Amino acid sequence: MADVRNPTKNHHGHHHLHALLIPYPFQGHVNPFVHLAIKLASQGITVTFVNTHYIHHQITNGSDGDIFAGVRSESGLDIRYATVSDGLPVGFDRSLNHDTYQSSLLHVFYAHVEELVASLVGGDGGVNVMIADTFFVWPSVVARKFGLVCVSFWTEAALVFSLYYHMDLLRIHGHFGAQETRSDLIDYIPGVAAINPKDTASYLQETDTSSVVHQIIFKAFEDVKKVDFVLCNTIQQFEDKTIKALNTKIPFYAIGPIIPFNNQTGSVTTSLWSESDCTQWLNTKPKSSVLYISFGSYAHVTKKDLVEIAHGILLSKVNFVWVVRPDIVSSDETNPLPEGFETEAGDRGIVIPWCCQMTVLSHESVGGFLTHCGWNSILETIWCEVPVLCFPLLTDQVTNRKLVVDDWEIGINLCEDKSDFGRDEVGRNINRLMCGVSKEKIGRVKMSLEGAVRNSGSSSEMNLGLFIDGLLSKVGLSNGKA
């Protein structure tokens, strides 16, 4: 049963648009959706934001609160909040049982969403726009059933979207879906420079494409071809040719970076884990002397790799803050770090379960970021001008590494061969990064990122305006208005 919190009367704003936002229920998707909700509400659009019961329970620690209550009372923005079942009990271990969770999202979640949408459409001020995560397989079907404008929000790079969008071309050319895939360059995707197959998303490199995640990707990218608009958390200056090529197929708007680069989202809690505040510890360290380490909210690291990285950190002798999620190896692996690691590190480092990443990255003592290369992390580290040490684990992270190291030159690889690396290589590359490699170039890339949102007539603000104009036109037509 859906739970809808609707504490404010609808004051529309001048747009008469009411958008339902539905993120894929993972931390890295919820975060940009929250920031998008505030961005749209700031334009006068009424927003109803949907979390699953599980995500809501994790964020609120089991309370019955509305995560937007604070920002709504401070700003007056018309953001409502609803929760819906993902088809599994709240207490089910989604990290340990990843495939079961994804299967529920593929086969069961749709029915709960449809029930919620049915309760929110119709009448004056009802929902008339649905903005759903691209990884859902049903948005165009639900939108068509209820007469909604359908928008897909892609929370990753446009390059990754384009490679998935053109899976048919990859199949035809033998670069995907074959027992023996080709290893030569992929040079036929519109708007995409020649790319090595090893730099495509991990799911595009696998020969067995029968997994539940592959089923989701296949169906989602069939569905996205039927939506009205696509929003993308990137900027025009980063991926201009790719975006222009996609625009010949579907209205595709780069409106990034959608990250918490100011305090407007400070009152919205989005973290699935309790955050540790390490500001006081960071205050004791010299400028640019601390390596921040985090492998994100979703992917797992093998115990073997984690041990080598830990010893490499000790060998490097650098100061560090290391986020070690409780389930970083597995939910049933309670102590993944080598015995005596924290004792040997002493005051040089702290290990924490989770933190506010932007708070750490923006601290002047932080001079490097060892990351899994999740897209949110890449945008945030560019914004904070912190060079990157790349250790991609899966999915789009592999392609993001290419952008960071090969194209933009704002970081280096932790290791050259992820299947065979050791602590000595880790220690050497940590020291290379902390000696200032890539610092100058990341400053230039930051200027592009900042320019996309801060300057008058900037690309992302202009694209957002074009998107809203498109929504008004679609809603006006469907409502019989001029």
UniProtKB/Swiss-Prot annotation:
Specify which residues bind UDP-alpha-D-glucose according to the UniProt entry for this protein. 297, 355-357, 372-380, 394-397
Task: State a single Gene Ontology molecular function.
Answer: UDP-glucosyltransferase activity
Write down the CDD domains for this protein, in alphabetical order. Answer: GT1_Gtf-like (cd03784)
Any idea of its EC number? Answer: 2.4.1.-
**Zinc: present as a keyword of the record?**
no
PROSITE patterns named in the record: UDPGT
Q: Is Transferase set as a keyword in this record?
A: yes
Enzyme superclass (EC) = transferase
Keywords from UniProt, A to Z, are: Glycosyltransferase, Transferase
Which protein family is it in?
Answer: Belongs to the UDP-glycosyltransferase family.
Output this protein's name: UDP-glycosyltransferase 86A2
